[in-house]
Amino acid sequence: MYPLNSIPGRKDVAFIKAKHGKGAAQNGRHSGSCAQAPASRWKQVLLTLLIFIALLALIGGALWQNICYNRTHYTAEFYQVHSRKLTQSCRVVFLTDLHLREYGQDNCELVQDIHSLAPDLILLGGDLVTYGEGSSYDNMLSLCSQLSEIAPVCGVLGNHEDELYFLDGDQALVEKFTAAGVTILRNQEARYTVRDNVISILGVEGSPADFYNYGASTFMDSVEPQTDYDLRICLAHVPTYFPEHLENYSFELGLAGHTHGGIVRLPKIGPLYSAEEGFLPDYAGGSYGLANNATLIVSRGLGDSSWVPRINNVPELSVIDID
């Protein structure tokens, strides 16, 4: 007989057992790693989700702050316009689309800012009120009265005043403006002498679709031959009035509002939407050249009339220096 440890093939058996035992241990380790892998993936998913939520919160907070800021603040935008005949420079302040908003009690902040700008003329682009928001316009009329103590004030009606006038039959609306010291131009001209310069202000009523129906074309034809002025400014509430019709006439400066700056202004793209032009409008805030070599300034306005908030679009008080 052979000793136990000298049995032929015994070492081989022991080696095989050891090998199998090592493999089993390795298999045990692999089984543990597989059990941990799903937990690791869930941690990654949870972390990604938390980062996404944090980014959404930051973006939402920034948007909300922007919206709130745009409801309580405005900026003075300065424009420079050159005139061929003006002998002395003058300053015009243009405000539009206030929609009954107040900046300070009784618009004291707005009035103080305009007073400090020392304008020679104050021009209104319409929509100082909002149709359907009650019949009391005391704050608007008070603002007009305060402005008339600073400089001569004239302007045009916007579509919201037109709705009050034509749909609600508020025939006294223009009289209320007049009593507050404002000259409302409804296809009419007003003239002012400013620093020895005669300034002609044309006020065109309605929208571009109304040009041939309610007297605007007849009015513009009637004043076209005039040359006895040093500067002519044309007012219209809707900016597309100018490229569609008004740039065929003689004036040096056009002023309009209505678009609220496109409501949302996208970085590197510009205004998002206007009622007349749809998405990505051409005329929704800023300075533009017209075919008659005039400058058109479209104000972003001072207020809002819809539930859609302004985003990246601070309300504007336009200040135009003409020399």
Regions found by a protein language model. Give the residues of each.
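N-terminal membrane-anchoring alpha-helices
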Residues: 2-86
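Beta-strand-turn-beta hairpins that frame and shape the catalytic cleft
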Residues: 79-93, 182, 189-203, 227-233, ...
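Membrane-embedded segments
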Residues: 88-185
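Active-site metal-binding loops of divalent metal-dependent hydrolases
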Residues: 95-100, 126-128, 159-161, 188-189, ...
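Short, flexible loop segments at the rims of nucleotide/cofactor-binding pockets, characterized by
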Residues: 98-103, 130-134, 207-213, 232-234, ...
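Conserved acidic residues
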Residues: 120-122, 230-232, 252
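Binuclear metal-dependent hydrolase catalytic cores centered on His/Asp/Glu-rich metal-binding motifs
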Residues: 168-182, 194-236, 242-244, 307-310
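Conserved beta-sheet core of the metallophosphoesterase superfamily
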Residues: 239-318
